[in-house]
Amino acid sequence: MKRSEVNQILKQTGHFFARHHIQLPPFARFTPQRWQQLDPKAWQELFDLKLGWDITAFGGNHFFTQGLTLFTLRNGSVSGTPYPKCYAEKIMHVREGQVTPMHFHWRKQEDIINRGGGNLIVELWNSDAFEQ
């Protein structure tokens, strides 16, 4: 995906979040120059837990049919150390017609809250010891 496409997606998502009164932390709007001015050690948890923006087409080239824009606000370490949180908080923007592949977590808890007013279809399955 070209940087210009990423920038346009971020802009559209920012407008969508604003319309629905979703407030993001200040680092959501940091410029590359601002990031370079920061002390990396002071922001290590953010880097380690991959907080911030994620725009994905899940390995494909069809973002507008199988894609997702999300902002991770809170996350924990899989092992529980050094960040013992079992809860992830992510704000997602799924566009009309987009689907996201299924996945699961052994140790994470997720709440799914539809703030945008669209139809949200979720299919749930139990997994076995072989992750099937």
Where are these regions (language model features)?
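Short, conserved active-site entrance elements at the starts or edges of catalytic domains
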Residues: 91
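Glycine- and acidic-residue-biased ligand/ion/polar-headgroup-sensing regions
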Residues: 95-96, 108-110, 114-132
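A short beta-loop-beta micro-motif enriched in histidine and acidic residues
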Residues: 79-88, 99-116
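A short, N-terminal "cap"/entry segment at the start of jelly-roll beta-barrel domains
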Residues: 1-87
